[in-house]
Amino acid sequence: MNQSYGRLVSRAAIAATAMASALLLIKIFAWWYTGSVSILAALVDSLVDIAASLTNLLVVRYSLQPADEEHTFGHGKAESLAALAQSMFISGSALFLFLTGIQHLVRPEPLQAAGVGVVVTLIALFSTLALVTFQRWVVRKTQSQAVRADMLHYQSDVMMNGAILVALGLSWYGWHRADALFALGIGIYILYSALRMGYEAVQSLLDRALPDEERQDIITIVTAWPGIRGAHDLRTRQSGPTRFIQIHLEMEDNLPLVQAHVIADQVEQAILRRFPGSDVIIHQDPSSVVPAAQQGFFER
């Protein structure tokens, strides 16, 4: 799983870096030629895109390193750190947009050769749409937090490019403050995306439990197994591509140890079939030693 995961996530990061680099060169020319503050906003965002995607590429490769003596649970949390770093980069670019937009709102300037800006923005819009489509497919296959953060960033780019087209069109017809107003609006949206991304990264670093539907799937698997009277203390978290699942199973007091082990092993394999690559720890408890207040999800 890790090989397939690493290959897909690396390809997504390489594709994002290559596209952002190409668009950066085009946007530098377009900004120099038109003087559009919205295109300048997109140019700055492309710089952030390159830095973020390169960070993703390096971090993903590091996160896939096997566990060692100092990192016995692996290096998957590096992905969450990358997402947190991205949120900081993006927040910085949003603040830059605010300052630039306010400056041009106070002192509006007519655009030069707005048609060039429209062509460049259309190229950026369709290129970014293609990248986001590919990233969404990678996220669906891998659930990578780093790629999901990158995808959210590029989704904001799609919104940005659409807003730039409208701003350029309005400025073309004499509404020169529209360029600055849209830059401010874009900055607000980017800042919102950055805060949401940072929140998700922090939750992962704090070992937030798996989603409710995944925990319910685990409970469903356990409840379907004969020989298990109950279950409690389900604890879950995720680090990179790896889910960590711990659960206590309640069994008959007089069940032979070997048979209890076989049942627990079968349950573990069933969980792994549902969540491949997970780290599963199962503890077996005689049902009589479990206090009533701790008895868990069901009782047969």
Swiss-Prot record:
Membrane topology designation: Multi-pass membrane protein
UniProt-recorded Gene Ontology molecular function terms: cadmium ion transmembrane transporter activity; ferrous iron transmembrane transporter activity; metal ion binding; zinc efflux antiporter activity
GO BP annotations listed: intracellular zinc ion homeostasis
Keyword Iron annotated: yes
Protein name, UniProt field: Cation-efflux pump FieF
UniProt record similarity statement: Belongs to the cation diffusion facilitator (CDF) transporter (TC 2.A.4) family. FieF subfamily.
Protein's UniProt keywords contain Protein biosynthesis: no
Cellular localization per UniProt: Cell inner membrane
Subunit relationships: Homodimer.
Primary location: membrane
Segments traversing the membrane: 24-44, 82-102, 114-134, 156-176, 178-198
Keywords for the protein's UniProt record, in alphabetical order: Cell inner membrane, Cell membrane, Ion transport, Iron, Iron transport, Membrane, Metal-binding, Transmembrane, Transmembrane helix, Transport, Zinc, Zinc transport
Coiled-coil residues: none
Catalytic activity reported: Zn(2+)(in) + H(+)(out) = Zn(2+)(out) + H(+)(in); Cd(2+)(in) + H(+)(out) = Cd(2+)(out) + H(+)(in); Fe(2+)(in) + H(+)(out) = Fe(2+)(out) + H(+)(in)
Species of origin: Klebsiella pneumoniae (strain 342)
General function of this protein: Divalent metal cation transporter which exports Zn(2+), Cd(2+) and possibly Fe(2+). May be involved in zinc and iron detoxification by efflux.
Binding-site positions, Zn(2+): 45, 49, 153, 157
InterPro entries xref list: Cation_efflux, Cation_efflux_CTD, Cation_efflux_CTD_sf, Cation_efflux_FieF, Cation_efflux_TMD_sf, CDF_Transporter
GO cellular component, one term: plasma membrane
